[in-house]
């Protein structure tokens, strides 16, 4: 299945559930069988189920397994009343999900493990939030269809909120974030935090973070005027003025660090990246950002968005890594 095709599965699940009560038993079965053949089988067949599976947790970037497998899992949950095979598929995704969080990396490809011991996923804030969000959408859907059944524990979930708080920069105006790799400083992670909160994984720092995000500040947010935001935005009236968390953090497993003068808005913050490069965390090692008085006065020199020709022509090369460029020049000389 083409990665862009995985969105067919959750959209089909929503459409099927919407009209489910208006369909006859035969219509439900006919539509379910068609969705299984055209959407579910290609997705779970490629990513999860034997003997058709051609992908692994190591395929593509760290975020793609959940983006594809978990969206297929949502469709499987929608079809499970009519099709025993769909129920089996949903269970297969559910049982495999903790392995994605536990992925230990690949030495041969110099690919680090997905999650740092102190929380967070290194493949840029944008894609960390995306991959985790897709995983949690499925996990929450599974919990909603298995009421009273305790979900399998995933230890990494307990540290995610600290990661997202540490890499944000509160300011007058929209909330900024570290934009190392393929990300933007206006991208935020309220969607992941809302899903965690809905699952019962809660703390006051989450409320503080969500309260800093302005409605509509980025493309994929869970805002109050969108279905997921409408459903899962918690009561933010009890959000604290400041988070209860330390002012510096080292993510040693993937080479990020942050430190700041205060958690008040428009303070001074230093963010440093010096670690692995892979996929969305591309070759901009030894980068740093300084935020001061609400502005990134020193920007990440390695940040470059897809349409820019330099994205492939420069940042995919060794010269795109500052420390390697120095060594390369010296070798040539």
Regions of interest found by a model, annotated:
Residues 1-162:
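Aromatic-lined, polymer-binding surfaces characteristic
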């Amino acid at each position: 299945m083409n990665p862009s095709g995985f969105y067919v599965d959750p959209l089909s699940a929503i459409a099927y559930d919407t009209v489910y009560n208006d369909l006859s038993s035969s219509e439900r079965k006919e539509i379910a069988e068609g969705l299984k053949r055209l959407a579910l089988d290609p997705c779970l067949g490629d990513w999860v189920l034997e003997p058709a599976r051609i992908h692994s947790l190591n395929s593509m970037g760290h975020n793609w397994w959940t983006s594809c497998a978990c969206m297929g899992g949502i469709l499987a949950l929608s079809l499970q009343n009519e099709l025993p095979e769909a129920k089996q598929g949903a269970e297969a995704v559910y049982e495999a999900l903790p392995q994605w969080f536990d992925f230990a990396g690949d030495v041969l490809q110099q690919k680090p493990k997905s999650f740092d011991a102190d929380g967070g996923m290194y493949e840029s804030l944008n894609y960390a939030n995306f991959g985790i969000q897709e995983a949690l959408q499925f996990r929450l859907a599974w919990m909603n269809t298995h009421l009273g059944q305790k979900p399998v524990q995933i230890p990494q979930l307990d540290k995610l909120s600290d990661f997202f708080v540490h890499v944000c920069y509160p300011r007058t105006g929209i909330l900024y974030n570290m934009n190392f790799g393929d990300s933007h400083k206006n991208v935020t992670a309220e969607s992941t935090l809302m899903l965690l909160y809905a699952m019962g994984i809660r703390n006051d720092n989450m409320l503080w973070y969500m309260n800093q995000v302005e409605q509509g500040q980025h493309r994929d947010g869970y805002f109050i005027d969108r279905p997921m935001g409408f459903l899962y935005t918690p009561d933010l009236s009890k959000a604290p003025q400041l988070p209860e968390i330390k002012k510096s953090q080292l993510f040693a497993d993937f080479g990020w660090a942050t430190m700041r003068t205060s958690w008040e808005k428009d303070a001074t913050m230093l963010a440093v990246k010096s670690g692995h490069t892979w996929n969305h965390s591309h070759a901009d090692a030894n980068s740093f950002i300084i935020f001061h008085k609400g502005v990134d006065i020193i920007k990440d020199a390695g940040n470059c968005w897809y349409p820019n020709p330099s994205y492939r022509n420069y940042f995919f090369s060794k010269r795109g890594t500052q420390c390697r460029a120095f060594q390369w020049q010296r070798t040539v000389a």
